[in-house]
Design a protein with these regions (language model features):
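Polyanionic, low-complexity intrinsically disordered segments
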Residues: 1-56, 63, 67, 178-185, ...
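Helix-loop junctions and short alpha-helical segments
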Residues: 43-183
Length: 242
């Protein structure tokens, strides 16, 4: 079963790279491998009805994130052998960053699909849609499937590419994520934690302490709180002018 999963993943990555000879040493392979794993982490689709309605998860997006960081906090309370603790902290770093990425992705999709104005801003500002071409006779069919196309595109988007996420939040939703150099570093470190079991490109073991995890939880939680408040304010009905 595991070999079938890896074969399917490799085939998908080669399709995205448009290179049938690509392998794990090809530029972009690791990022796409990460994306494939995250897109296939659930047995059932996260979003169910593409063409008609946005289907939210049973828990709130913030609730799902909070559950992840609460679990991480509880695990840090355990008394472990130093060698075990080092590896647990490495796994927790990857888990927390993944939880934030999931929140950023789900929140952006939900908010964008909630308004035709936001959908239009996305279509007009994102190069992926700006470069698409179709014939006159396709206008109506493309219009009917627009929301479905957008939902699928956003779900497939690699949301740990923070350089892409930040401007999308700003240009489409008008939400400024603020200065987050720590997040760029956390995402880069997550890559080593997830794909190299805590070792960097040179084979050096990365260092993650309990203080690092606690600080990461605080920064991620603060960012989630900010975005959640901004989204709530943004979606409030505007008072009518008399």
């Amino acid at each position: 079963m595991e070999s079938q999963h890896e074969e399917a993943k490799a085939e998908w990555i080669r399709e995205q790279l448009d290179d049938e000879d690509a392998d794990e040493y090809t530029s972009g392979w690791d990022d796409l491998s990460d994306a494939y794993d995250e897109l296939n982490v659930h047995d059932e689709p996260y979003y169910e009805d593409w063409d008609n309605n946005w289907v939210a998860p049973k828990q709130t997006r913030k609730g799902i994130f909070q559950e992840s960081v609460d679990t991480a906090s509880e695990l840090m309370e355990l008394s472990l052998f130093p060698s075990v603790e080092d590896n647990v902290l490495i796994m927790l770093h990857g888990h927390i960053v993944a939880a934030l990425e999931g929140y950023l992705s789900a929140t952006f999709i939900s908010a964008t699909l909630s308004s035709n104005d936001f959908i239009r801003k996305l279509v007009e500002t994102d190069p992926e849609f700006a470069d698409r071409k179709f014939t006159i006779k396709e206008i109506f069919s493309k219009h009917e499937s627009l929301k479905s196309d957008i939902a699928k595109y956003l779900q497939d988007l690699i949301f740990h590419k923070i350089d892409k996420v930040r401007p999308m939040y700003k240009s489409v939703l008008g939400i400024d994520l603020g200065k987050t150099p720590w997040l760029f570093k956390a995402v880069a470190l997550r890559h080593h934690c997830v794909h190299r079991a805590g070792y960097d490109h040179e084979g050096n073991k990365v260092s993650v302490s309990k203080d690092d995890i606690q600080l990461l939880i605080k920064r991620c939680s603060d960012l989630v709180d900010k975005i959640d408040n901004d989204v709530v304010d943004m979606l409030k009905p505007k008072p009518q002018k008399i």
